[in-house]
Amino acid sequence: MNNYLEKFEKMRVAGNLAARTLDMLTENIKPGITTDYVDKLGYEFIRDHGGYSAPLYYRGFKKSLCTSLNHVVCHGIPSDRVLSEGDTINVDVTAVVDKHYGDTSRMFCLGETSVKVNNLIDATYESMMKAIKILKPGLKLGDIGYEIQSFIEKKGFSVVRDFCGHGISTTFHEPPNVLHYGRKDSGMELKPGMTFTIEPMINAGKWDIKMLNDGWTAVTKDKSLSAQFEHTLGITENGYEIFTESVKGYTKPPYL
């Protein structure tokens, strides 16, 4: 009997709340609001639907979600920064329900963006989905990284090396690390019941990053734009399940 079915059921609930939070934010993110307001909306939605926001007070983080604008790679801290026409922003949400975690992120474009920006965002989303679609028992973690890296580098972009996907279930971050670059047929073998994130961070320029003095915010070293998408997934007997799919069918910009 599949002893992970109960875990998967709880992961579905947490993942669904995280996805619905992003769906709500998709309909509210626009020029003129602050990233603090985005954080407030996310916090209240998760709270009002029976969960709590995992990032809040995690290792001293003081906000409920991450808002990473333009050349910020990840872990941007919500602030009084006002969103403007032409900005791109990644919003990363992690909801906890019944001690299980659902972690997902999505890119947003404010107003008109250039062809290069759109190509970067499209490639980032497509690289994540290409990796997801090959998931099944017996696959190796290196196959995931290879799928993303080979696709992205053909597009002329680069894969961030300093951050990766991770195991997730009743803990926010747990083994294994899921690298977004790698060699085919290398690393840990996937088995039914495993749950983890795939969350490629892709830069328009070089992959090098630097950390800001706040200890959280990672930015591209060359100030090129960065993009990211993320899903929480489980390995089934024959393939995979995405726990954080949009309820409203929002995948990548433009959403509305």
PLM features: residue spans?
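Active-site neighborhoods and metal-handling regions in enzymes and metal-associated proteins
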Residues: 1-256
